[in-house]
Amino acid sequence: MKFANLNLIYITKQKAFTIIELLVVVAIIGILAAVGVVAYSGYTKSAKKKVTEANHKVIAKYIQNELAKCLIGESKILDYNGSKQFDCNGTHNSRGNIPGYIEKIFNDKIQDVYEPSTAAMTVGGPIKCHGIPKSYGYKKLGYQGKHSISINVGYTIIIIETCVEDSGSPVKTDISIE
């Protein structure tokens, strides 16, 4: 026997991932990341729309509540920095100032979720939602996230319009003053 004196040496095979296995794992991680980014983007877009709709409702409720104060006997409403802005017993034409007061009050309280550095509300209307670039200035009506307030010619209806989408018709609420 020629091999009788040989000491048997066991060579253990090192365990490691092959390059193919590593590439498969990296590809799977990449796919999961891509799906996650798309899902997150959709989630934030939906959240911004919901916040814009909620802000519209808050503005409408605030105006309704303030006008109700006039009906129960308060003489002044629309508090801005500790000062009441509107005289309930004032002239019919003084109602034309209400949109300006509301604009001041809410530009201090809410933000445009799409462009936080610009005012969320402006006086004007009627509006149609469109895709004007933000660089046109914050006073331009009709782009997503903006709220518009106006009053009809007879000073009897306050109109709030909000662009929730970047195109189409705005969400609109009419509030009777009388």
Residue ranges and their predicted role:
Residues K2-A4, T52-E53, K61, G90, ...:
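Intrinsic disorder/low-complexity signature
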Residues A68-E178:
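Periplasmic/extracellular, small/polar-rich flexible segments of pilin-like filament-forming proteins
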Residues I9-I11, V25-V26, V35, N81, ...:
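Low-complexity, intrinsically disordered/propeptide-like segments
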Residues K13-T44:
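N-terminal single-pass transmembrane signal-anchor helix
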Residues M1-F17:
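N-terminal leader/signal peptides at the extreme start of proteins
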Residues K45-E74:
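Membrane-proximal N-terminal amphipathic helix
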